[in-house]
Structures are given as C-alpha cells and as structure tokens.
C-alpha cells in the first residue's frame, strides 16, 4: 500500500459557521474588514489557528466565503486565511477565477497578504483588496516572516485591475497580534 497522500481536506473551526451571517449585507469597506478582524480575534481566543482572518464579498457586500489561518492545526503551510477564503469562494461559485463571468468580487483581510497570498490574489479573480494591518505590523508584533513583495506591490495589483485600499481599522487589526502574543501564540 502506498504511503503517498492522494487526498487533502482543510477545515475551518466549528465556531466559524455559527459566527457568519449569510443574510447580512456588508455595505462598506470598514464593515468588511471589521468582520475579518473579528474572525482573526476569535481564532486566537479559541486557539484554533493564527491571528488572521479574510473574507470574499460580492461588490454589493454579500458574504461569499470567510477564512481564518489554519496553518498549525492543519499542518499545512498554505492554509492562510486568504487562501482558505479564496478556495471556499471558488468552490461556492464553481469557478477557479471568481470574476471570469464579469461579476465583481472583493477580498477583505485583517492584514496585508504575505508573499504567498499576494501571488494567489492575481489569479483568484478579485477586483478589490481591502487591508487592515500592514506587513510591518505583522512582523513587529508577531515576529512572523511575511516574505518578499515587489517594491511597488500595490502598483502591480492595480496594473492588473485590482484596486487596493489599506489601513482600514489598522489599530484594531494590530490589537489581534498583540493578543496573540499575549496568549503565547506560536511563531511559524
């Protein structure tokens, strides 16, 4: 019998499904990022993963998917909040590129994407990226290494039709990292 894995399953914590409200309309950027910060904090408080949250919305503010960081519980380096949100959104709409039919999508994230999630953003099919904390906040408060980005990373996204807005509720997002550190969160 082969010892090679031929299937993979990534799960979000049980508390997440009880937290999300599919009927709610997130009509502004602040409410969308606030959700991701709340998810990140719950993930830390419940000890179910790292201090990051992300969500995909339609342009009019309907929640399509949400994710939290599950790297350590899932033993999977790609189980970042943004990646989880992208994969779940793609599964829900049944398209590998969310916006390929002209519908517009937004990714809100509690922190600036690392190099992995930044790269995935080009192909995920989103039209707008909303960011809470900056990379320097993550690295200063958690000692995580977020990896290299192009010097003009925002310009690279915008050149491909992805609008970027950052520093949305930045202080609140930074608070999640402080709480993670306070609770002895593991660096990975």
Where are these regions (language model features)?
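Short beta-strand scaffold segments in enzyme catalytic cores
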Residues: 52-61
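Short loop/turn motifs at secondary-structure junctions and domain boundaries
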Residues: 45-48
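A short, polar/charged loop-to-alpha-helix boundary motif
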Residues: 70-84, 88
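Short, thiol/selenol-centered motifs that function as redox-active sites or metal-ligating centers
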Residues: 107-124
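Zinc-dependent deaminase
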Residues: 1-43, 103, 120, 124-188
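Mobile, glycine- and charge-enriched loop segments
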Residues: 86-111
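Conserved hydrophobic/aromatic pocket- or pore-lining residues that grip, position, or stack substrates
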Residues: 36, 53, 85
